[in-house]
């Protein structure tokens, strides 16, 4: 269901970009140990294992976006490069991954070399909030759970439009503010999670649709897939209780402790409707004539 048209403005969380960089520099090894090759939600249909569910989410987004084989792709907020390498392997894409973290870029580049993909992928250290499109446009922009960190999303989507070729596609998976986020308890829960997860803001499905349309793109898909991805945080909460995590957590700094303790809150936010998870696909109009 594609909706939109909202005048509500989500609260902004006071997040320092330097803290986001420090977070990923410090915790990327932990992410790799906890989540595996892909540091994003899974998509469950039939009780899949976590690794298969994470691949299924990428498959779902790529299928909806109709990513063509051999496409040039820009992955903004690429993390450890899981999607970059998967797109190169499965679709023979040439992919550039942007990450704010030098540590993530180094880890991703090493993985690309081990897989023999360094001739088709590259990783650049760049803050998406300051990213500017280059003269060479791309077939697709891929954003897997990173837009939560972007301060000015309307402006960001305008830059995406500039970076896409005519007929190019924008493919996004994003954490969202849910329908029950307006009441006091839901709002507090969203704020606690947003700050712990270093989000600039958490916004609604309607806001994403409106901003993408205002940027000049045609929205093809805007789907709430919360029910399929929610088991992610049950898995993460269980992993956080396994040795040595209960012993290590008290030794961590305050932001890391807040991050780890937000795992069960994500379960609550999805269960109560305070938060949701969206999948979006939009296309740049083809050139006329």
How does the language model describe each region?
Residues 74, 83-130:
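Class I SAM-dependent methyltransferase SAM/SAH-binding core
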Residues 37-38, 48-69:
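Conserved alpha-helix/loop element of class I SAM-dependent methyltransferases that forms part
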């Amino acid at each position: 269901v594609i909706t939109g048209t909202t005048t509500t403005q989500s609260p902004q969380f006071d997040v320092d970009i330097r803290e986001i960089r420090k977070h990923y520099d410090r915790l990327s090894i932990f992410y790799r140990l906890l989540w595996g090759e892909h540091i994003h939600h899974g998509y469950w249909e039939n009780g899949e294992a976590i690794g298969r569910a994470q691949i299924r989410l990428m498959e779902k987004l790529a299928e909806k976006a109709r990513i063509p084989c051999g496409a040039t792709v820009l992955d903004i907020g690429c993390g450890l490069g899981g999607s970059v390498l998967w797109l190169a392997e499965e679709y023979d894409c040439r992919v550039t991954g942007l990450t704010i973290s030098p540590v993530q870029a180094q880890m991703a580049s090493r993985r690309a070399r081990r897989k023999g993909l360094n001739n088709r992928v590259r990783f650049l250290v760049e803050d998406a909030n300051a990213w500017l499109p280059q003269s060479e446009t791309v077939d697709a922009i891929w954003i897997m759970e990173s837009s939560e960190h972007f301060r000015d999303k309307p402006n960001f989507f305008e830059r995406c439009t500039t970076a896409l070729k005519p007929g190019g596609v924008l493919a996004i998976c994003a954490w969202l503010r849910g329908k029950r986020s307006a009441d006091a308890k839901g709002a507090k829960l969203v704020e606690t999670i947003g700050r712990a997860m270093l989000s600039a803001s958490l916004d609604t499905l309607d806001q994403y649709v409106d901003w993408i349309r205002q940027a000049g793109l045609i929205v093809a898909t805007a789907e709430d897939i919360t029910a399929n991805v929610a088991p992610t945080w049950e898995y993460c909460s269980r992993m956080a209780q396994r040795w040595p995590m209960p012993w290590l957590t008290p030794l961590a700094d305050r932001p890391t402790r807040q991050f780890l303790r937000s795992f069960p809150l994500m379960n609550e936010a999805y269960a109560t409707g305070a938060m949701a998870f969206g999948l979006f696909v939009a296309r740049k109009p083809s050139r006329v004539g």
